[in-house]
Each structure stands twice: as structure tokens, then as C-alpha cells.
Design a protein with these regions (language model features):
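C-terminal peripheral helix-coil segments that are non-catalytic and often amphipathic
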Residues: 96-100, 104, 136-173
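A short secondary-structure junction motif
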Residues: 32, 58-65, 97, 101, ...
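Hydrophobic alpha-helical connector segments
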Residues: 24, 35-64, 117-120
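The alpha-helix within a helix-turn-helix
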Residues: 1-2
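Short amphipathic alpha-helical segment with a characteristic S/N-K-E followed by hydrophobic residues
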Residues: 17-22, 32
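All-alpha amphipathic helical-bundle segments outside canonical DNA-binding/catalytic cores
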Residues: 49, 85-86, 103-119, 136-143
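Short secondary-structure transition hinges
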Residues: 60-107, 115
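Short hydrophobic/aromatic patch on the recognition helix
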Residues: 5-15
């Protein structure tokens, strides 16, 4: 409230409690992400470009995020419920991009992407609540898991694109 020059009283006039405030923030963030991905997808030449754009955006967010914030979300069951429901919808949307990537010869055609999506979601949730975040930043964990995943699902053509993307990321550091 102080950083925004808003009194707590004003906040509680607009929101009945912290959970409602958090929920509204997550709803707004989700809407922004949907708009962003839609814009990227409409201009992308292939499915990997969409995934790379999502990766960059998520990495930027995680760089700024304190892992304790995610752990504190356990205190707000409605927020967690919303996040889990949105994750299911996001996974369904991701399946469209994976299928497009299969058709483009970028992703392997012998993978059940529904299982992979659910496994990745569970893996990230497990990391958030584990001690690994005490030793490594969320952004590094996200990056390592994402590219381990990408290497497992891409064809040789897709792998060349992944390697080129990773090289460009290293050069920018």
C-alpha cells in the first residue's frame, strides 16, 4: 500500500480481504498473459517461437518473485483453487501449440503432451514448496526444468532451434 501511495483503509474499501485482492491480481495477470500469448501466436512463424516468448516472460517474472510469496499463497485457498483451474486451462491451450509443433516437425509425434503438461505443472508446484528454492533462484530452476523438457520433446529440427535460442540467451547475458 505504501509503495502505491494508497492507504490500507482505501485498499480494504475496495477489497474485503487480502485473499480477494490477491485473487484480483491473479485474474488480471492471467488476462494480460492470455493477451500477450495471443499476440505472439498471431505473429509467430512456428510453435517454438510462442514457447520461447512465454519462457522469456515467465523467466522475467520469476526473477522478480520472492519464493516466500508462493509459499504464502497456501494461506489463501480460493487463490490456489483459481491458480490450479487456470493451470488446467493453460495446459489445454498449450496442447494446441504442441500439436502445431508436431505438424511443423519441431516436436516429436510419439509423446502424450497431456501427460507431459500435467507432469511439468506438478514438478513446478513441488519445487515451489521444497527446499531447493533456498539454494537456487526460481528463475534458474524454471530455466533448467524448461530446457530439460524441451530437449526431451523436440525433433532434431526443433533441437537446433532450441540450441540457437539458448545461444542467443547466453550472448545477451
Amino acid at each position: 500500500a505504501c509503495a502505491l501511495s494508497i492507504s490500507k483503509r482505501t485498499l480494504y474499501e475496495l477489497f474485503c480481504d487480502k485473499e480477494q485482492l490477491l485473487l484480483e491480481v491473479f485474474v488480471m495477470h492471467q488476462q494480460e498473459m492470455i493477451t500477450y500469448i495471443s499476440e505472439v501466436a498471431s505473429k509467430a512463424q512456428n510453435a517454438l517461437e510462442v514457447i520461447f516468448a512465454f519462457y522469456k516472460r515467465k523467466l522475467s517474472e520469476l526473477t522478480e518473485l520472492n519464493p516466500l510469496f508462493l509459499r504464502d499463497l497456501r494461506k489463501y485457498p480460493n487463490v490456489l483453487s483459481y491458480i490450479r483451474e487456470r493451470q488446467k486451462q493453460n495446459d489445454a491451450a498449450a496442447l494446441v501449440h504442441y500439436q502445431k509443433g508436431v505438424e511443423e516437425g519441431i516436436f516429436r509425434d510419439d509423446i502424450n503432451f497431456d501427460i507431459i503438461n500435467q507432469a511439468i505443472s506438478m514438478q513446478f508446484e513441488m519445487f515451489v514448496y521444497s527446499d531447493i528454492t533456498e539454494n537456487y533462484p526460481l528463475s534458474e530452476i524454471y530455466s533448467e526444468v524448461t530446457f530439460l523438457h524441451m530437449r526431451g520433446i523436440t525433433t532434431p529440427k526443433g533441437m537446433q532451434m532450441v540450441d540457437a535460442f539458448l545461444q542467443s540467451v547466453k550472448e545477451k547475458r
